[in-house]
Swiss-Prot record:
GO biological process: translation
HAMAP family according to UniProt: Ribosomal_uL14 (MF_01367)
Protein name: Large ribosomal subunit protein uL14c
Taxonomic lineage: Eukaryota, Sar, Rhizaria, Cercozoa, Imbricatea
Organism: Paulinella chromatophora
SMART domains: Ribosomal_L14
Assembly description: Part of the 50S ribosomal subunit.
Database matches in NCBIfam families: rplN_bact (TIGR01067)
Amino acid sequence: MIQQETFLNVADNSGAKRIQCIRVLGSNRRYAHVGDIIVAAVKDAMPNMSVKKSDVVKAVIVRTKATLRRETGNSIRFDDNAAVIINDDKNPKGTRVFGPVARELRERNFTKIVSLAPEVI
């Protein structure tokens, strides 16, 4: 579960390394899960890239440490909290996605992120 002030790793090559959640988008929501969109501030970034430190960006969560229950009864959990930075059209800013992503992103119409990911769990 991701909430305000949570730090996340960035799982793409947009230039940001770590972001901090400012707000979970949605009607008065407190927690975000896989596939939810958040507003975040870039806390650590690589030089000479499109995303700079202290930029405010939108991101979609692709991995969480919290257990994710599926309708089949399976549960899945990742080693870190990670997000992919997106633009206003819900397309990723980077051209690569690192690490596995959850299958729930396909159901939420983030097919571009799923196609860029090396592994979908």
